[in-house]
Regions:
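The feature captures the beta-strand-to-loop junction immediately N-terminal to the Walker
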Residues: 69-71
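Conserved ABC ATPase signature
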Residues: 158-162, 166
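Conserved ABC ATPase "signature" region
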Residues: 139-154
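Conserved ABC transporter NBD signature motif
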Residues: 92-106, 110
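Catalytic Walker B motif of ABC-type/P-loop ATPase nucleotide-binding domains
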Residues: 183-186
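Hydrophobic anchor residue at the start of the ABC signature
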Residues: 172
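Helix-to-loop junction immediately C-terminal to a conserved catalytic motif
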Residues: 84
Length: 186
């Protein structure tokens, strides 16, 4: 077992008001899913190094928010990198709606919002950023997301001209517009 100070602690809480939580539970049950995300016995080490973490398991239902807590170097970002398919775990598995996911599948089904958003924003305007990679006309959806994130007035602005918090809202907006079933925020 890893020393207590290197273990990853995690807590589960619902981040929505009561009525919203009920909506997400109803939506989840109506789609016949028991858990949106299941992580079982995940472990990781860099090449021949010691374990960064091991035996990490948790479940997250649709609408749940999970906070991963730990000191610097505990493996929080490494865990997110595995969950998003950027790194391959040493052991364990990640499932979405009961289906085991490969790292490649995890990359396409999740969206990672990083603390330093400058590496995630590429377009010439906020609106263009939200529509990148979309195959269909999604103007109504983009308008709704811009309104919800209080970014409507910044639609035509270059992402680099926004504050740090506004940039983070843009990256969260991208995840919402793309309907990513799982959103990770680091």
């Amino acid at each position: 077992s890893l020393p207590e100070e290197t273990r990853i602690s995690y807590g589960l809480r619902t981040a929505y008001p009561e009525r919203d939580a009920e909506h997400y539970q109803e939506k989840s049950h109506s789609q016949n899913t028991t858990h949106l995300l299941e992580v079982h016995d995940l472990g990781f080490a860099y090449k021949k190094g010691p374990d960064v973490f091991r035996n990490v398991s948790f479940e997250a239902h649709s609408g749940d928010v999970i906070g991963i807590l730990g000191h610097n170097g505990a493996g929080k970002t490494t865990l997110l990198s595995i969950l998003t398919g950027l790194l391959k775990q040493r052991h364990g598995e990640v499932r979405l709606d009961g289906k085991k996911l490969t790292p490649r599948q995890r990359r396409s089904l999740s969206y990672l919002v990083m603390q330093d958003t400058d590496y995630q924003l590429f377009a010439s305007s906020v609106e263009e950023e939200l529509s990148l990679g979309m195959q269909e006309d999604c103007k109504e959806k983009i308008d709704a997301v811009l309104n919800a994130l209080e970014l409507s007035d910044y639609r035509e602005r270059h992402p680099a001209s926004l504050s740090g918090g506004q940039k983070q809202r843009v990256t969260i907006g991208v995840a919402i517009v793309k309907d990513s079933p799982v959103i990770y925020i680091d």
